[in-house]
Amino acid sequence: MSKQYFGTDGIRGRANRFPMTAEVAMRVGMAAGLSFQNGSHRHRVVLGKDTRLSGYMIENAMVAGFCAAGMDVFLLGPIPTPAVAMLVRSLRADIGVMISASHNPYHDNGIKLFGPDGYKLSDEIENRIEAMLDRDVELALADSESLGRAKRVDGVHDRYIEFAKRTLPRDMSLSGLRVVIDCANGAAYKVAPAALWELGAEVVPIYVDPNGFNVNEECGSTHPMSLAKKVHEVRADIGIALDGDADRVVIVDENGTIIDGDQIMALIAESWHENEKLIGGGIVATVMSNLGLERFLRGRGLELHRTKVGDRYVVEHMREHGLNIGGEQSGHVVLSDFSTSGDGLVTALQVLAHIKRLNKPASEVCRKFEPVPQVLKNVRISGGKPLEAASVKAAIADAQAQLGDTGRLVIRPSGTEPLIRVMAEGDDPELVRKMVDSIVDAIADARTAAA
């Protein structure tokens, strides 16, 4: 079934434009509220957001929708996505909502939905909600005496901080580590520095002054160079960059070298394997993860399971096959011993604890393998199906033939933006670049011809 509203990570788009309008948000609240009313108890939803200006509009619209469906709404305010996933279970809610467009600029926003178990919704449930959105959902709303109430919940930041701290041993202190934390002017701007400080680290917080417009603006996990500069400036031991909703993380070592999600997964997998904590004999990553990670794991007798892009699909594979580490190169890392979704802060704490235990610089601990040369380019499209053009198919076939068994090629439409992503990797960097450029040019030509 083709989806009109939901993409790879919920509903996302430019704020106040379809589908991220107040009207659609209200109807999502109605439809989702009606979909999660099993049992005779008083039904409730926990609702968090990041720091975007449009969050107020979407939040209020969704409150109206959920209350109209007869659900009580617990308002969390600005808080990380993984905190919503944790609190939907802790507060015994029927559904959790995070209003965020993750790493996107402020003018975008999105809606992520979690079930009562703290996991993102399956395609099947999203399809059911989609079907309700286009029907006369008002006919099934609550009677006037059964409408929901909305209330703001106090203390949720402290609850999440304690949850994050409990992922480390009780005797583990980060004392002696100088840590720069870049919160991307996003949802973790309060909780992340506080958690690190409470664990004993010397904390240098940056990008912790959200104004509604500056989330992810030249900062955070998609722009780690500002963090690298600050790490060098204050002579920190390590830097941590989160994104707008803090479900992804990128690390910077003391030399300013960027450590992506693949390296982080390799580090944690090796550590857990050595300590007999790794379950399932491998980890889960997406088709975009570097071939170097696969080779690193294979050298240790571990398997890399690949899924399509989207941390939701990573988690589904982890649950289906009984693995406890998964993630994406972008920095979504899911550690199912602790969390049901990607959690940037919890992941960073595992890295810091490993550095502390080994008593070695981050540069010696965090870079576990030499990445295979990889090139990723995006082609913006405005409609049509350029991947079906004969010239594009020919360029792809040629690239696959030339890369052979020593490389990989991934071409896919973005699930969150009007882009086609072209990625290739292999041991010959010049060949990789040439193959990506040929496919990008073919897609661009097909796009122009169809315009």
Swiss-Prot record:
Amino-acid positions noted as binding Mg(2+) in the UniProt annotation, renumbered to this chain: 102, 243, 245, 247
Keywords (A to Z) from UniProt: Isomerase, Magnesium, Metal-binding, Phosphoprotein
Species of origin: Chelativorans sp. (strain BNC1)
The protein's name: Phosphoglucosamine mutase
Gene: glmM
Names of the cofactor(s): Mg(2+)
Broad EC category: isomerase
Top-rank lineage group of the source organism: Bacteria
Cofactor note: Binds 1 Mg(2+) ion per subunit.
UniProt xrefs under Gene3D superfamilies: Alpha-D-Glucose-1,6-Bisphosphate, subunit A, domain 3 (3.40.120.10), Alpha-D-phosphohexomutase, C-terminal domain (3.30.310.50)
Pfam families, per database record: PGM_PMM_I, PGM_PMM_II, PGM_PMM_III, PGM_PMM_IV
Listed NCBIfam families: glmM, PRK10887.1
Catalysed reactions listed for this entry: alpha-D-glucosamine 1-phosphate = D-glucosamine 6-phosphate
Gene Ontology cellular component terms for the protein in this record: cytosol
InterPro entries, sorted: A-D-PHexomutase_a/b/a-I, A-D-PHexomutase_a/b/a-I/II/III, A-D-PHexomutase_a/b/a-II, A-D-PHexomutase_a/b/a-III, A-D-PHexomutase_C, A-D-PHexomutase_C_sf, A-D-PHexomutase_CS, Alpha-D-phosphohexomutase_SF
